[in-house]
């Protein structure tokens, strides 16, 4: 049978009467300009011999959308191929556009624009933290998101499974454990970390270097460290008998001085957990040569975490040696820079009262008494326990569901509580079952709202999760109750207010993690020998630059063209040194003007972008070109055909990356995308 007849039959079979226009207009274009490269005998992801025309099928609909876009933009057929007749092309595109639009509207009318969207891991964590007044990493208990183009809040990619439900319950249990704190009151005062005289740290002063010793030393009034690579093992607070006994805010104060320092050094503070395997730089304070500096840091710590101090931005000895090369003389013979810690103190948890405010707010109206015999606090109901419980659910329900709750909803959760027993099942345990159910319910996990225009409460919720990643605050709730939020002036004022709130940084961080792929910053680790300058301080500065840059554009309402080329950026001393900029001191990130001939400016030349589009050792024109097309231009290229591997083209004789990719582009199925990917990739 003639192939053109086969194609027409395949495209027409099953078409309703209104689809006959498709047969007449689209099939001739496919036969004339497409089928030679897109049939069963070619290595491309599109095969017109198999594609149907049932636009109610989501996969088929997406295929025809891509076909329309590429033909409409002139990307297909390729430039080397014969161009289609303009009348034929325009007629086919007009019919295809009409069919796609009609199918899309029909789907929206039947199913709505999108499926129900649930809270992301980040939104879940922030919402529970803000409702219960807690901290802690709750997201770690939840499964990874099935992201779409790096964004986790795309409804059609989200899902919920038995694994999700179990994970939500685990996370809620962890949140309630922290929120209901009725143990003995933490001891006041603080803890002095005596690194000079502690038995554990002292044994490292004289131990041979081959056994990990002699990389630290003590002077008459200080403990000196020369590198953070091994010293954390020596200076870990848990090795000195201290880990954080309660979750909450703690204050760390210390005094440090640069030892043998000829340049500014950093006094770093890290928090870590053996249980969860995470280590995070939480503070970096610059100390100038010859000066002593007192530092202070208030930070949230989880139960069981520990911390350690570290010297950062330390230059090696004049002869180029680092501390680990001092096999004989050790730390006392080393001439490089170090950090000398004179004293360090920890205070906390910083609670004004005990049980803490978060516990009293949760157990609203329930008296809490001290039982000296058992050295614990206990709930002591003054009315029927279920009446107390009803008060708790009535208080938290509107926050959890981001809307008013009905009496029936309140009773449905109250009824889940086990019977009260003063000793075996007291009030503070009785409340857990209803709250556990509430915070794992569809009303909490999914964004509400009915089809059609949003009501005021749904609008308040959409706004708060857009800019704050959490539930509305009391001002938004009040405007929603009064039905004033839809007023354009009121809405504009609220957006401006919310953008000035520190919580809007959650939006900035989360959006840039997805849009610019900053979440991939740790996907590769630069080779230490090739890039010894890369470390935690540079990494933090690299991440801060695009976030502060984006924040500046929002706060000052600057033009979008700054994303491509700007006359300013944000740096600190460490990042400026990486960029080769002079006369920048201090670890504080600040806006700096760029000269007209600077290679910096805009997003594309920022260090974080260049890192997430490299492989840790070499630059990658393909990754960088793909990033430009997908993130800046919004035209992500198609994935390669499954039958095409990166090494399949003949690259014999190629030497440079440019020559390698030139050989790659000789393959027809690769050329159509790489002709767009490679040019911006090489520019970067």
Model-derived regions: residue spans:
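Sec-dependent signal peptide recognition
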Residues: 2-9
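Hydrophobic h-region of N-terminal signal peptides that target proteins for export
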Residues: 9-19
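Low-complexity, glycine/serine/threonine/alanine-rich intrinsically disordered linker
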Residues: 20-46, 59-75, 79-684
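The substrate-binding groove and active-site-proximal loops of carbohydrate-active enzymes
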Residues: 52
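Glycine-rich, highly charged phosphate/nucleotide-binding loops
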Residues: 56
């Amino acid at each position: 049978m003639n192939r053109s007849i086969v194609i027409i039959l395949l495209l027409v079979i099953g078409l309703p009467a209104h689809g006959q226009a498709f047969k007449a207009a689209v099939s001739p274009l496919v036969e004339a300009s497409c089928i030679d490269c897109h049939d069963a005998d070619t290595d491309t992801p599109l095969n017109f011999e198999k594609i149907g025309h049932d636009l109610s099928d989501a996969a088929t609909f997406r295929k025809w959308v891509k076909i329309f876009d590429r033909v409409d933009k002139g990307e297909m057929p390729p430039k080397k191929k014969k161009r289609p007749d303009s009348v034929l092309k325009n007629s086919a595109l007009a019919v295809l556009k009409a069919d796609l639009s009609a199918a899309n509207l029909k789907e929206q009318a039947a199913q709505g624009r999108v499926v129900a969207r649930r809270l992301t891991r980040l939104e879940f964590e922030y919402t529970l933290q803000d409702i219960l007044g807690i901290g802690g990493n709750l997201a770690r208990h939840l499964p990874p998101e099935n992201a779409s183009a790096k964004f986790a809040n795309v409804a059609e990619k989200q899902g919920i499974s038995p694994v999700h439900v179990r994970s939500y319950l685990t996370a809620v249990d962890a949140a309630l454990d922290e929120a209901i704190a009725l143990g003995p009151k933490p001891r006041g005062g603080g803890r002095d970390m005596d690194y000079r005289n502690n038995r554990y740290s002292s044994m490292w002063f004289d131990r041979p270097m081959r056994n990990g010793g002699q990389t630290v030393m003590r002077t008459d009034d200080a403990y000196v460290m020369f590198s953070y690579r091994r010293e954390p093992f020596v200076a870990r607070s848990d090795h000195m008998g201290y880990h954080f006994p309660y979750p909450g805010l703690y204050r760390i104060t210390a005094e440090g001085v640069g030892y043998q320092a000829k340049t500014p050094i950093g006094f770093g503070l890290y928090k870590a957990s053996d249980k969860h395997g995470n280590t995070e730089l939480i503070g970096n304070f610059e100390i100038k040569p010859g000066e002593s500096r007192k530092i202070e840091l208030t930070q949230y710590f989880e139960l069981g975490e520990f911390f350690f101090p570290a010297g950062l931005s330390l230059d090696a000895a004049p002869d180029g040696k680092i501390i680990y090369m001092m096999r004989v003389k050790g730390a006392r013979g080393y001439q490089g820079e170090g950090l000398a810690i004179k004293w360090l103190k920890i205070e906390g948890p910083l609670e004004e009262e005990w049980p803490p405010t978060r516990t009293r707010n949760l157990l609203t109206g329930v008296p809490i008494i001290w039982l000296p015999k058992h050295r614990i606090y206990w709930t002591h109901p003054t009315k029927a326990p279920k009446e107390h419980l009803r008060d708790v659910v009535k208080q938290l329900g509107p926050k959890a569901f981001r809307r008013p709750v009905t009496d029936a909803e309140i009773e449905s959760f109250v009824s889940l509580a086990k019977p009260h027993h003063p000793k075996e099942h007291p009030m503070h345990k009785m409340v857990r079952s209803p709250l556990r159910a509430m915070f794992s319910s569809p009303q909490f996990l999914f964004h509400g709202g009915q089809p059609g225009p949003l009501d005021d409460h749904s609008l308040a919720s959409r706004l708060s999760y857009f800019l704050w990643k959490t539930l509305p605050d009391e001002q938004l709730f009040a405007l929603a109750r009064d039905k004033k939020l839809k007023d354009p002036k009121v809405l504009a004022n609220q957006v401006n207010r919310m953008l000035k709130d520190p919580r809007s940084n959650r939006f900035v961080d989360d959006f840039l993690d997805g849009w610019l792929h900053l979440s991939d910053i740790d996907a590769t680790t630069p080779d230490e020998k090739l890039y010894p300058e890369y470390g935690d301080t540079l990494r933090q500065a690299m991440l801060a630059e695009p976030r502060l840059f984006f924040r500046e554009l929002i706060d000052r309402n600057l033009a979008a063209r700054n994303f491509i080329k700007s006359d300013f950026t944000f740096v600190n001393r460490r990042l400026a040194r990486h960029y080769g900029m002079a006369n920048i001191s201090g670890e504080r990130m600040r806006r700096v003007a760029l000269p007209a001939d600077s290679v910096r400016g805009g997003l594309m030349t920022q260090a974080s972008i260049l890192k997430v589009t490299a492989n840790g050792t070499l630059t990658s024109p393909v990754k960088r070109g793909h990033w430009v097309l997908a993130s800046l231009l919004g035209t992500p290229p198609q994935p390669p055909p499954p039958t095409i591997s990166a090494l399949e083209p003949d690259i014999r004789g190629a030497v440079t990356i440019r020559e390698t990719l030139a050989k790659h582009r000789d393959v027809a199925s690769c050329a159509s995308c790489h002709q767009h990917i490679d040019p911006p990739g090489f520019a970067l």
